[in-house]
Every structure is written in structure tokens, then in C-alpha cells.
Amino acid sequence: MLDQKDNLLSSYNYDLPKDLIAQSPTRSRHDAKLMIIKDGLDDSLNLVHAKVWDIKDILKPADLLVVNNTRVVKARLKIRLSGGGAGELLIMEPRGDGRWLCLGRPARRMRGGDQLWLDTSRDNSLILKVIDKDEKTGGRIIQFSNEFTSWTEMENLLDLCGEVPLPPYIDKDRSSGHEENYQTRFASKPGAIAAPTAGLHLSDELIENLKIRGIRIAQITLHVGLGTFRPLEKEDLSQLHLHSEWIEVTEETIKAITTCKEEGGKVFAVGTTSVRALEAAYLSGRGALKPYEGKVNLVIKPGFKFSVIDGLLTNFHLPKSSLLLLVSALIGRNRMLKLYKHAISNKYRFFSYGDAMLITPESVI
């Protein structure tokens, strides 16, 4: 049952001590804490404290994990501005013919027609051109040379002179190893500018143990972009729109889901991006889960009816984020806030490198 507060952004706020923002992962990926939510009572704190490693003993042989196989690219580029000075581009997505949507800084000094210089070595530079402002995102359309038409070609350039685009709450000076730590073990398809962080918990050893126990793993692709990480701003959520992100749900994954359900298993999404991809594919199939490739901007908030997933492995998310809305759609906003307060009291670590929550099928409202 929805109440009016479910459509107010301020209803998804909470206070987090800064020292609970994880600056690096646990020593082993699967050593993170795991809060297991046990039932669907809105006022209940029926939960178990465990480790992510224990998930192998919680899931059953017929169950299925669905992971996101996107790979984070080194999308942050340092550039020189027309008229002098330094700037920065965050590569977002291809727009065809060597043009890319980018977030620029300082944006006020990137006007249509301006040239930018990207140093690819000590003696060589690429000349880029600002085409126009993108009104939907506030970003800039930047012209690269025509050889950079897709993420495959662009990644070669980014590997040469780009940096991993870490979230602003991670202090780059306090930790290292991000090129490896900020990728999941399934990362194979370039195109994300942020990691699907729940997947970071699955170590090679844990993956092998899951398979030995008969727990299957299927993959989707959602290139994490503005739709996932851009902060929400408008208080009224009734007309919320998110930036589109590219997804792919394959026939192979659909067969795995069908088999799982036929055998009485449960489908657990690993991360909110896997939820969005699967539920968007279902809606695009008009009531049937079919292969899908393209952009989606699905909003999942309280009142949403889930049709594919039964449970969710997810991290603890930022206040007032679309990810908190999705978690609230599964377990209720009031309960989500109580669980987050409990996590803070028990020193759970938050955000990208932080601990995890397992929302079990019996806890979904």
C-alpha cells in the first residue's frame, strides 16, 4: 500500500557517518558483510548477519544468479581547452560518426565550435571539436575522428590516456588498485562509466563454489551511465524520468531463467542494473520475456510490479538515489530505512566498495 511520502524524494534520505563510506574493497571480494532479509513484514527487522561467502549455502541448486557483464572503461580524459587551461571529459556514449556524448568540465568553457586537445603521448595530440550542448543531459557532443565509432575502438584510446572514473566519494589518494578492484569477474563488454557494484563481491572462488553446488549464473549487459548514478533532484517523484542506458538480454539468458522457474528455482538479480535490464526486457515483450537489445529508461519505485526477479543481492546505496527507490519497491520504503539505520548501527560499509544486502524471495512485499 503506497502512501504520499513514497513519491517524495526527501522520504528517501538518511544520515550516514563519513567513516562508513568504503574507500577500498575487503581483502577478499567475498569477505564483505551480508545482511540477509528474511520476511516481508514492513515493520520487521527479521534478518541474519553473515558474509557474502555464505551465499553459497543460502541459495539452492535450482536457483539462478543473473549478473551484469559490462566493463568499466577508463572514461575520464584530461584535455587542454581552447584559449588555454586544463579541462576534463567523461565519455558517456557513442552518437555516431565519431561523435560522443561527454560530460565536460568546466562546461562553460566548452561551447559549440571550440577545439579541445587530448594529449596521447609526449609529442602527439588529438584535436577534438565541441559540436553542441546536449539539452537532455547538460553534456557536450564531442567530435572525435571517425575511427572512434564504438566502444571497442574508443577503449583502445581510453586505455592509452584515460583514467578509471571513480565515484566522488572514493578518495583516490587513500587507496589504489582501482583498475582491477573496480571491475567484476564477469566484465567483458566495454561501455560502463561506473561498476555494477554488487557483482564486485563475487570472487573466482565463490563463483566456482556456486557452480559446484548447482547454482547457475546467467549474464545480461547494462552499460552503467547517468540513469544509474546521476543524483535525483526533483522532490516530486510521480513524473520521474531517468536517462536511458543500453542493455542486452540474450536468448541464452532467457532460457536459463525459464529453466530455473520450471525447476522451481528462484531468480536472484546481482545488482539493481540486472533488475532493470530483466524487467525492462519483460515489459518490452508485452508480458513475455524476450531477447532485447537497445536503450531503456525504466523507473522502478514503490508500486512497481516485478515479473522476472525473485530476489536481489545489492549494496547499500546513496541517499535520494534511484537505486534506493528500486530497493524500496521490493521491501517497502519504511522497512528499507529501518534496515539502513540498523546497518549503520552495526558498522556496515556503504556504497561501491561496501557491504551487501540479500533480499530473499520471502522478504519481497
Swiss-Prot record:
Coiled coil: none
Subcellular location, record wording: Cytoplasm
UniProt superkingdom: Bacteria
Pfam families: Queuosine_synth
InterPro entries, A to Z: QueA, QueA_dom1, QueA_dom2, QueA_sf
Keyword Ubl conjugation attributed: no
Pathway, per record: tRNA modification; tRNA-queuosine biosynthesis
Any single GO BP term: queuosine biosynthetic process
Enzyme Commission number(s) of this protein: 2.4.99.17
UniProt GO MF annotations: S-adenosylmethionine:tRNA ribosyltransferase-isomerase activity
Catalysed reactions listed for this entry: 7-aminomethyl-7-carbaguanosine(34) in tRNA + S-adenosyl-L-methionine = epoxyqueuosine(34) in tRNA + adenine + L-methionine + 2 H(+)
Listed PANTHER family: S-ADENOSYLMETHIONINE:TRNA RIBOSYLTRANSFERASE-ISOMERASE
Chain's role: Transfers and isomerizes the ribose moiety from AdoMet to the 7-aminomethyl group of 7-deazaguanine (preQ1-tRNA) to give epoxyqueuosine (oQ-tRNA).
The protein, known as: S-adenosylmethionine:tRNA ribosyltransferase-isomerase
Organism from which the protein derives: Prochlorococcus marinus (strain NATL1A)
